[in-house]
Amino acid sequence: MLKIIPLLLAALGVVSAAAYAAPELTVTNFGQSIESENVSGANDVDDLWLWNTVGLKYDDWSFGLTAGKQWNVDFDDHDDGYKKGIESDNSRIQFDVAKPVTENLKLTGRYRGQQNYDRFQVGYAYNYGMFLSSGDFFYDSVNGDGHDTFHAEWFPVGVSLGPVQIKYYFEYVKNLGDIQLGKQEESFDHQIRVYAPLYKGERLTLSTEGRFTIMQDKEFNGKTKKGYNVYDDFGRNRLYLKANYALTENLDVFGTFGYEMRKYKGKEGANNANDDYWSNVVVGYNYKF
């Protein structure tokens, strides 16, 4: 009997250690994607990015690492400063962290480093019943010429109506430091955003997102010399179509197409700028563990 007691105690110790094992840092997913952006009248492809992403988890903490490389692509000759050919002039490294603090509230943080700026960001996401609220607030430290800026990208209120979400979006940008006379100090942007599923099959899911600008305004230090342009009321509208296809239980491929139409109005004597458009295409894969 005396010989059995130490064995029982040792077994209990092993079980206790397993039951109360410290959490481990684990990889949850990784993926790659290619993203292109284009504005009418500029390069063939204004921005072409290759993204590499990794997700991690530790206890109830979530982490993300993103690394990207950017290229400008143009195959035509221009007289307006755009260069012909393929040229890389930027890259990005980004760290994300998120932690739920209550059943309804999650806090987030982000650091983004690029050749032209460093970003320090905090945010939150809150939901209660059918009501939603979230926001990201960040400071951009500009590398080189230009002003450091403070940004607020805020969804003060939103509602879930079944699978559809409707949110009010407010964006505020403040240029910091000494602003020269006639230069922009801050800008305001008000939008309604709508998110909705379109189709859900055994492997394929389709969804859409709409962004509709209600109004935009800008504030300057004194009067501008030549006036300025803002988006016309309801003059900027963007639609996304998003698709995801599950190749296996762990591997998904996805794609996104976005298109935005823009209409401007001049202020302080400026002529209305020409209408233009913006487009965005993303294709990639994500592997989940």
Kindly label every feature range from the protein language model.
Residues 127-228:
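Detector for outer-membrane/organellar transmembrane beta-barrel domains
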Residues 29-36, 65-69, 109-113, 135-139, ...:
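Transmembrane beta-barrel strands of outer-membrane/channel proteins
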Residues 44-50, 87-93, 116-120, 146-153, ...:
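Residues that define the transmembrane beta-barrel architecture of outer-membrane proteins
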Residues 25-26, 60-65, 100-107, 128-135, ...:
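Repeated loop/turn-to-beta-strand initiation elements of outer-membrane beta-barrel proteins
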Residues 20-79:
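Short glycine/proline- and aromatic-enriched beta-strand/turn motifs that initiate or cap beta-hairpins
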Residues 52-58, 95-99, 122-126, 152-161, ...:
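Residues on the lipid-exposed face of transmembrane beta-strands in outer-membrane beta-barrel proteins
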Residues 93, 193-260, 265-269:
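Outer membrane beta-barrel transmembrane domains
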